UniProtKB/Swiss-Prot annotation:
Role, per record: Catalyzes the initial step of the lipid cycle reactions in the biosynthesis of the cell wall peptidoglycan: transfers peptidoglycan precursor phospho-MurNAc-pentapeptide from UDP-MurNAc-pentapeptide onto the lipid carrier undecaprenyl phosphate, yielding undecaprenyl-pyrophosphoryl-MurNAc-pentapeptide, known as lipid I.
Cell location: Cell inner membrane
An MF annotation (GO) of this entry: UDP-N-acetylmuramoyl-L-alanyl-D-glutamyl-meso-2,6-diaminopimelyl-D-alanyl-D-alanine:undecaprenyl-phosphate transferase activity
GO annotation, biological process: cell division; cell wall organization; peptidoglycan biosynthetic process; regulation of cell shape
Annotated membrane topology: Multi-pass membrane protein
Pfam families: Glycos_transf_4 (PF00953)
Keyword S-adenosyl-L-methionine: no
Record has Cell membrane as a keyword: yes
Entry protein name: Phospho-N-acetylmuramoyl-pentapeptide-transferase
Organism: Caulobacter sp. (strain K31)
UniProt keyword terms in alphabetical order: Cell cycle, Cell division, Cell inner membrane, Cell membrane, Cell shape, Cell wall biogenesis/degradation, Magnesium, Membrane, Metal-binding, Peptidoglycan synthesis, Transferase, Transmembrane, Transmembrane helix
Pathway annotation from the record: Cell wall biogenesis; peptidoglycan biosynthesis
Cofactor(s) for this UniProt protein: Mg(2+)
Catalytic activity: UDP-N-acetyl-alpha-D-muramoyl-L-alanyl-gamma-D-glutamyl-meso-2,6-diaminopimeloyl-D-alanyl-D-alanine + di-trans,octa-cis-undecaprenyl phosphate = di-trans,octa-cis-undecaprenyl diphospho-N-acetyl-alpha-D-muramoyl-L-alanyl-D-glutamyl-meso-2,6-diaminopimeloyl-D-alanyl-D-alanine + UMP
Length: 371
């Protein structure tokens, strides 16, 4: 919205108005969206948590077959803390992003839609006091429909460059120089799998205090930089990246994700006063997945978000192996609970997973030069 004001003033010949002139700089708007999102999330935190406690009563149900100490330590903790993140994310993005940018609206649309889906899941769990909310099939069908619509919108309406003809339906491979495969309209399915899959991967990771949100912020930082670089024709040319017109604006959204995440972590730090819930995890995973699709770095997301991928794979492997043999590979899935069963303290698991996520973000950035 503030960018609209700057745009209106600049068209009227008033582009040099102090302070507002700063809005033409993407880096400034990214920083301001981060700060704004943080302030919004922190400011609403205490009252929102008290309200959630009053409304939810017993709070988020804890798995009875899980880690024994969690049943005692985490009982009564409210969920739906994702609302705090999303409030900051949307306020920061709407204030400082260019709202004429189709990439911004696609990412915000995915984020909001998945947030609503997550809220419905959290609401069902809290009201029924069960760890089973919406069925997996219900969530997946909704996620795929939304993701398919988003992919179609990008293919049809996203700005195109004469030098990137066909890029909107192509998969760009990292490291392997100039290896690009045009999937045609099959790309819609690929994009939907990327968005929905990563959304669920983040959801599965959100099982310990602070575990998911910090890796989400690492990934958002990485993809904010990637979006900034591939959206700038000079930087893209220098780094031999495929230029994606106008996608740099997503750096502002990534800044808002980071700021909202920091504000939420203020209250989610151990011992957590509130859980993110599916309201936050499904939305943030969808946001990162859609940003990767917009920036044409879907495969790099598998590296940067490798921690989330590993968590999801551990569940898939556990379920498949158990169905076939009646035995379990891991003591408990997702894999962070496996390490708890091995005797690792919760804080040890969380911090070590943060380290892994940070290193994977660096590896993902390194692929920009390994071409």
């Amino acid at each position: 919205m503030l960018y609209f004001l700057y745009d209106w003033l600049s068209r009227g010949g008033h582009e040099h108005v102090p302070v507002l002139n700063l809005l033409k700089y993407l880096t400034f708007r990214t920083g301001m969206s981060m700060l704004t999102a943080y302030v919004v999330a922190v400011a609403m935190g205490s009252r929102f948590i008290r309200w959630m406690k009053a409304k939810q009563g017993k709070g988020q149900p804890i798995r009875a077959d899980g880690i024994a100490r969690h049943v005692v330590e985490k009982a009564g903790t409210p969920t739906m803390g994702g609302f705090m993140i999303l409030a900051g994310l949307f306020v920061g993005s709407l204030l400082f992003a260019d709202l004429k940018n189709v990439h911004v609206w696609v990412v915000l649309g995915i984020t909001g839609s998945f947030g609503v889906l997550g809220f419905m899941d959290d609401y069902a769990k809290v009201t029924k006091q069960t760890t089973a909310g919406l069925s997996s099939s219900q969530k997946l069908i909704a996620q795929f429909i939304i993701s398919i619509l988003a992919a179609v919108v990008l293919i049809i309406f996203a700005p195109k460059s004469p030098t990137t003809v066909g890029l909107e339906t192509s998969v760009v491979f990292p490291i392997l120089k100039n290896l690009v495969i045009n999937l045609g309209w099959f790309y819609v399915a690929f994009a939907a799998i990327t968005i929905a899959g990563f959304s669920n991967a983040v959801n599965l990771t959100d099982g310990l205090d602070g575990l998911a949100i910090v890796p989400v912020m690492f990934a958002a930082s990485t993809f904010g930089l990637i979006a900034y670089l591939v959206g700038n024709v000079k930087f893209a040319d220098y780094l031999n990246l495929h230029y994606v017109p106008s996608v740099g604006e997503l750096a502002v959204v990534c800044g808002a994700i980071i700021g909202g995440g920091m504000g939420f972590l203020w209250y989610n730090a151990p011992p957590a006063k509130i859980f993110m819930g599916d309201t936050g995890s499904l939305a943030l995973g969808g946001a990162l997945g859609s940003i990767a699709v917009c920036a044409k770095h879907e495969l790099v997301l598998g590296i940067v978000g490798g921690l989330f991928v590993a968590e999801a794979l551990s569940v898939m492997i556990q379920v498949a192996y158990f169905k076939k043999t009646g035995k379990r590979i891991f003591l408990m899935a997702p894999i962070h609970h496996h390490f708890e069963k091995l005797g690792w303290a919760e804080s040890t698991v969380v911090i070590r997973f943060w380290i892994v996520a940070m290193m994977l973000s660096f590896v993902g950035l390194a692929t920009l030069k390994l071409r």
